């Protein structure tokens, strides 16, 4: 299989990935692998493609200012890939996927349990033709259990996995009640766990020569990510509650209203609290037994926080930020998304990059946060148009122009 030559020197530039996934969790992992240099082929349905292509507005606009078929959602998770359209319901389409999988290192899929087995595209089949293949299935609930065959989306898994029970304002305050996180955090975490799992399997394959089958369930990821809140319950026997912006285990950490805006204060230890008290003109607080230790501050936050709230209202946000930064006390303004991209640190780290796009001219992308000293991540390929690379990929597995044209006429690609 003649996968496209890469100019990038990413650490995975020798790896070939077949990405049969759609929506976000699987594609996010595929994008992580592509950012690391892997050649990722994204298999999509003819004429329709990944569901997220239509999840808008907003949509990317072409050079004439007209909306394209690429939504902002789709563009967030498919950078660096090549798109191939294949109808998996046909024998010819299944043959194409088997040919691609035979030469791939990793296969990602997130179909409902048992679906790909009906097409002869399951791990048991591929293991016979490519023993080194690492095949990863990403589903809502994993491959077994009473909910294994159920469909799932990020929002419902945030609810089922307990995240919404500890996210949002306290129930007895205005705006209280269950709240989801502002980005699809379960999908993103699932994508990251998927990436870690397949890379671990690659490392093991280097020793054994054998691939593996990996089963990732979104609910498992959510339960495995409730971290301190899960252990808070297991240690205390008490169900954690929503605390708004207040940290359940560390104080003071909260959003404080200033004279002209808001600031986030994150005091992580007793030394930082003492520094805050100097800035706030309250040098006696660190010696007060109610506030001397973090445990005391957590127990007495009902006393401490109202006094702090009154102090913050006395000065503008910029004054607080300048003084706290100078004292080494962690704090931050609450940026809007546009303000994030204008932040001096974000600009210095070059977190935005414009990539060439066949219809829009260029498309902005948020680059990977991973930085290496012995490898370079080059961002060269925009999220692909639907089927943009079908011809070149099929030519790479021996399909001639006549056969490709016939498959196109038949609607198979």
Where do the PLM segments sit?
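N-terminal helix-loop segment corresponding to the beta1-alpha1 unit
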Residues: 2-207, 242, 385, 391-413
């Amino acid at each position: 299989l003649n996968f496209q030559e890469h100019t990038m020197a990413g650490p995975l530039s020798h790896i070939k990935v077949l990405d049969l996934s759609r929506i976000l969790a699987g594609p996010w992992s595929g994008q992580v692998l592509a950012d690391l240099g892997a050649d990722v082929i994204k298999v999509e349905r003819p004429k329709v493609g990944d569901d997220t292509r239509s999840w808008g507005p907003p949509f990317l606009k072409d050079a004439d200012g007209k909306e394209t078929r690429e939504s902002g959602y789709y563009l967030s998770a498919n950078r660096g890939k090549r798109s191939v359209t294949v109808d998996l319901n046909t024998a010819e389409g299944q043959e194409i996927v088997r040919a691609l999988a035979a030469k791939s290192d990793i296969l990602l899929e997130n179909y409902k349990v048992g679906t790909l087995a009906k097409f002869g595209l399951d791990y048991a089949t591929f293991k016979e033709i490519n023993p080194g293949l690492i095949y990863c299935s990403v589903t809502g609930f994993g491959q077994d259990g009473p909910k294994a065959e159920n469909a799932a989306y990020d929002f419902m898994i945030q609810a089922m996995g307990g995240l919404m029970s500890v996210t949002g304002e306290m129930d007895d305050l205005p705006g209280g009640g269950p709240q989801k996180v502002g980005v699809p955090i379960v999908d993103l975490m699932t994508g990251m766990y998927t990436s870690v799992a397949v890379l671990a399997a690659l490392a093991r394959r280097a020793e054994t020569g054998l691939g593996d089958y990996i089963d990732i369930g979104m609910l498992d990821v959510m339960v495995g990510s409730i971290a301190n809140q899960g252990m808070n319950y297991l240690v205390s026997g008490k169900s954690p509650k929503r605390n708004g912006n207040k940290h359940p285990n560390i104080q003071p950490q909260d959003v404080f209203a200033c004279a002209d805006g808001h600031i986030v204060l994150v005091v992580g230890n007793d030394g930082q609290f003492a520094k805050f008290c100097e800035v706030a003109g309250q040098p006696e607080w660190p010696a007060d037994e109610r506030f001397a230790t973090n445990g005391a501050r957590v127990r007495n936050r009902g006393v401490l926080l109202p006094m702090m709230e009154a102090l913050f209202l006395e000065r503008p946000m910029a004054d607080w930020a300048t003084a706290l930064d100078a004292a080494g006390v962690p704090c931050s303004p609450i940026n809007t998304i546009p303000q994030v991209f204008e932040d001096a640190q974000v600009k210095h780290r070059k977190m935005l990059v414009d990539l060439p796009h066949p219809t829009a001219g260029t498309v902005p992308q948020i680059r990977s946060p991973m930085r290496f000293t012995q490898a370079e991540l080059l961002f060269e390929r925009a999220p692909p148009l639907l089927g943009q690379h079908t011809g070149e990929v099929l030519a790479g597995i021996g399909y001639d122009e006549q056969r490709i044209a016939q498959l196109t006429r038949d609607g198979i690609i």
